[in-house]
């Protein structure tokens, strides 16, 4: 089977560690999300930060091919990359912009979620110079404490924004801070937003992230913003049975050693063998995005069995105990994240061991790690990102 390449990407021609992305699972998760929302509701698929580490362009193309209406991004650089890749769908920058970016944002026909009058002014001025209308979504800070207009100042600021002649207000939105964990706090934010709905005379609303989508159906308004669930990672444990993770991270055994009882493993001698052991050295480390905090905690899958990580994870290598797998040899595959046989290692599992969140686990996978895309309908052939 031939492979499509992306010349702008630089990946090892002979990778020792790589990621496989399953297009079938991605489409399955899109269908699951569609089943949760009314037919009129549009999806804003969040593809910022390289589509949560999965690869911006291939994921975006597959989402558009699958009917997703809007792509949510971090900044103008991502917008330019998408436009240059031939994607003409609606784009929405979710984060604050700088004044120097306003002109190019308007020229590329990109919407912006704004949290200040200044952003609105910069965009309106740029749009006026170009004879266009700048597209904005107005965010209200109902409890997140990050972006959005403060409710007590909102009406005053909006009166100023409405006087900007080259601005098109496309929607009103907010962002839930505790949709995964606190139903009451989420409902409080929702009710805070509704206080201002009359002010917009029927403008579209979006509030729901992946977690909120499964909290209450009323949160699925005119748009829903879905990120984590698209990639098959459950924002809440009960959702795991509904979603399919689309990413598998693999590497290879590069060395096998027989070591005696009491032998130290890796920097700092943080682990000493409790018995004579067979140790495999794997071709991945924290320099590739595999968290050092997983040292002496995580396992990897080899031949469908869990093999514990021993010692400190190093920049490009880690060690695992394969004493119970005598048939292992150099070159065998190891699964760092994903399924092999009947065993699975999830992003949630690694996040818990690292005392972080699943978002960080997947976005940490370094951009130099080769991504192989399988069963993607937006491309005629299996494609692999490499030089």
Swiss-Prot record:
InterPro entries noted in UniProt: Ala_racemase, Ala_racemase/Decarboxylase_C, Ala_racemase_C, Ala_racemase_N, Ala_racemase_pyridoxalP-BS, PLP-binding_barrel
List GO terms (cellular component aspect): cytosol
N6-(pyridoxal phosphate)lysine PTM sites in chain numbering: 48
A GO MF term: pyridoxal phosphate binding
Gene Ontology biological process terms, A to Z: D-alanine biosynthetic process
Q: Required co-factor?
A: pyridoxal 5'-phosphate
Per UniProt, the keywords (alphabetical) are: Isomerase, Pyridoxal phosphate
Family according to the record? Belongs to the alanine racemase family.
**What is the protein name for this chain?**
Alanine racemase
Q: Which gene encodes it?
A: alr
């Amino acid at each position: 089977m031939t492979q499509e390449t992306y010349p702008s990407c630089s990946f090892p021609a002979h990778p020792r560690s790589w990621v496989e992305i399953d297009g079938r699972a991605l489409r399955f998760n899109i269908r699951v999300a569609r089943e949760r929302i009314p037919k009129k509701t549009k999806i804003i698929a969040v593809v910022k930060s390289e589509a949560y580490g999965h690869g911006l362009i291939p994921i975006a193309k597959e989402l558009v091919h699958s009917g997703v209406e809007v792509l949510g991004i971090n900044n103008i650089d991502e917008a330019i990359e998408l436009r240059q890749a031939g994607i003409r769908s609606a784009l929405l920058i979710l984060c604050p912009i700088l004044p120097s970016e306003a002109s190019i944002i308007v020229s590329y026909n990109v919407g912006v979620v704004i949290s200040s009058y200044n952003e609105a002014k910069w965009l309106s001025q740029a749009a006026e110079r170009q004879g266009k209308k700048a597209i904005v979504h107005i965010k209200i800070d109902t409890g997140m404490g990050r972006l959005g207009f403060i409710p007590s100042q909102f009406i005053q600021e909006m009166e100023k924004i409405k006087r900007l002649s080259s601005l098109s207000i496309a929607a009103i939105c907010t962002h839930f801070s505790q949709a995964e964990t606190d139903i009451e706090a989420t409902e409080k934010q929702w009710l805070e937003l509704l206080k201002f709905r009359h002010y917009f005379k029927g403008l579209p609303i979006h509030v729901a992230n992946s977690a909120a989508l499964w909290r209450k159906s009323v949160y699925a308004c005119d748009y829903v913003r879905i990120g984590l669930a698209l990639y098959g990672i459950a924002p809440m444990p009960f959702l795991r049975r509904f979603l399919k993770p689309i990413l598998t991270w693999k590497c290879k055994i590069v060395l096998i050693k027989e070591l005696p009882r009491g032998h130290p493993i890796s920097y700092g001698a943080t682990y000493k063998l409790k018995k004579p052991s067979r140790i495999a050295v794997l071709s991945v480390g924290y320099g590739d995005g595999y968290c050092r905090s997983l040292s002496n905690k995580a396992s990897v899958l080899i031949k469908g069995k869990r093999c514990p990580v021993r010692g400190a994870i190093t920049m490009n290598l880690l060690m695992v105990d394969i004493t119970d797998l005598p048939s292992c040899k150099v070159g065998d595959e190891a699964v760092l994240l994903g399924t092999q046989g009947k065993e699975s290692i999830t992003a949630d599992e690694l996040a818990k061991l690292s005392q972080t969140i699943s978002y960080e686990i997947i976005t940490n996978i370094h951009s130099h790690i080769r991504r192989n895309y399988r069963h993607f309908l937006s491309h005629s052939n299996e494609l692999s990102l490499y030089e």
